[in-house]
Amino acid sequence: MTDASTRGPGTGRVAPEELRSHRWFGTDGLRSFSHRARTRQLGYLPEEHLGKPVVAVLNTWSDINPCHTHLRDRAQAVKRGVWQAGGFPLEFPVSTLSETFQKPTPMLYRNLLAMETEELLRSYPVDGAVLLGGCDKSTPALLMGAASVDLPTVFVPAGPMLPGHWRNEVLGSGTDMWKYWDERRAGTIGDCEMAELENGLARSPGHCMTMGTASTLTAAAEVLGVTLPGASSIPAVDSGHERMAAASGLRIVDLVMRQVTLSQILTPEAYEDAVATVLALGGSTNAVIHLIAMAGRSGVKLTLDDFDRIARTVPVLADLRPGGRYLMEDFHFAGGLPGFLGRLTNVLHLDRPTVAHDTLREQLDGAPVHNSAVIRERSDPLAGEGGVAVLRGNLCP
């Protein structure tokens, strides 16, 4: 599903002198002379970068963010793919938004990361970008900033952590801590059990493996068309995740050379499909806030009325916690988002482009579903209408 050789939107290829970075490195002037000298200072030979697409690898890795602790290695895989495709990767550290540790809330800093992303891409000599993130607000922040600059861009989602385990229970990191904390308050479990739960709740790098905000927004990014197919559900520590990162590096170079920019991908139709997918997944209500903000950066008007209208046309087909029974690893091996979207084709805009294919239709062609208990048939939905209801009135200001 993540084969970098698949075609994508756009025709023709730009000449090296048409690249944005050429203005920094390729002209016969004092500034380019200085920039080339400083690139030598970085340890690069001219033949390693001159005339090649410069790809910014924006990495939200940090020691303090457990959702992203593996992204240091994934950035290396992305850079490997860029080198292999004939590009010149440069890694940029950007702010990390840790839902667990950042107080009073990372929401205060979403727009700060969006601004940082925008200004880094705008001010440096880069032709395209690969964005690495996944913990809740990181996904919208990175895509908001990138949308404002409108370069060729691929998003590499951090991926869900492994399922939690405690005795005979499978734990969902984003939900079961509340459940068992209430049980402790009620006196039904004690300190010994709580210590065991601490060991079993979060077992690996990656974001929460329930269909909470993180999984909802990375799924939205995939259906928007800015990730490789199937990328959003690959477990963070699965070797397939590293392969996806490398394939994303390969892919971005092709997108740069064909000048497939984010504005060609993030269309009104793409945002409608993202809303439909979030609703059919039974995803987080936080997606309402973030998708509206992302659409605004893309010049697309998206409102609560759109969520209400689309919710009446899509059933809930994903049996995922917290509203269902299963976790993201189950969803991935049941078919992931490609298989899931294959059951929503009647409400999707199938002729729009993605970073991987000329059309979403082509991207979904033949995508299987392996477990209809996890990804339900349309004839057997969890609910007849989407998972978000819009209320209005004096109790809903």
Per-region residue spans from a language model:
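Short, well-structured alpha-helical segments in soluble
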Residues: 112-124
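Catalytic or ion-coupling anion/metal-binding cores of large enzyme and transporter domains
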Residues: 2-63, 67-69, 74-95, 100, ...
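A short, small-residue-rich loop immediately preceding and capping a beta-strand
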Residues: 122-142, 153-158
